[in-house]
Amino acid sequence: AAFKAYKRGAYIANPCYTQIHPTCIPVSGDYQSKLTLMSESLRNDGRIWVPVSKEDAEAIRTGNKHPEDIAEEDRDYYLERKYPSFGNLAPRDISSRAAKEVCDEGRGVAPTGLGVYLDFKDAIERLGEDVIRSRYSNLFQMYEKISGDNPYKTPMQIFPAVHYTMGGLWVDYNLQTSIPGLHCLGEANFSDHGANRLGASALMQGLADGYFVLPTTIANYLADQKPGSINTDMD
């Protein structure tokens, strides 16, 4: 719909701004051609880590070691180490950049080298498996179907992927595009996020545009429109 509007003359704004999502399933197997999006809610309880040493990471990538073989002191919970105030809930761009950095250092754990662990072991010990299952069972099932690993028993592997473009149809403060009378709200417009969108903003944008802004602005626009003449000739 946005592209159709663009073809009719509507302006596009900020097409270069792209959001990266840090919690995706890395490419694996013969049929998964791209990373698969997971929910950011997983980072509420999962702890993100990679091995401290490149040698341990290489052993995991080649199948000579498993994550359970890495002792606690040989694990780098890098978000907790670098950002103690946020820990594993650091903003998306920071978490994504940090994951790429440790993988670029040679400490990635996926077969491709592009993956880090999201580990629920401590949360399961603290809260119990039933609580974790009640929160994430659908996500865990999806992960297991794709990867073949049981995340209740072994850490998930995750890696950042392109998620969202902040760009969209240009709108003014009344949410009207450059085509008079064509209004655009929610994720289809460009207006709210700048160069980076914070997590959990999609619902907020839809509510703000659709509930608070558009009912007033579109009513004002329609109130200013004068009806044209009506042809009453039925012949």
What spans do the regions from the language model cover?
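An anion/pyrophosphate-binding glycine-rich loop and adjacent beta-alpha core
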Residues: 10-145, 216-219
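Accessory "access/gating" subregions that flank catalytic or transport cores
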Residues: 127-176
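Short FAD-binding loop at a beta-strand-to-alpha-helix junction that anchors the flavin cofactor
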Residues: 174-198
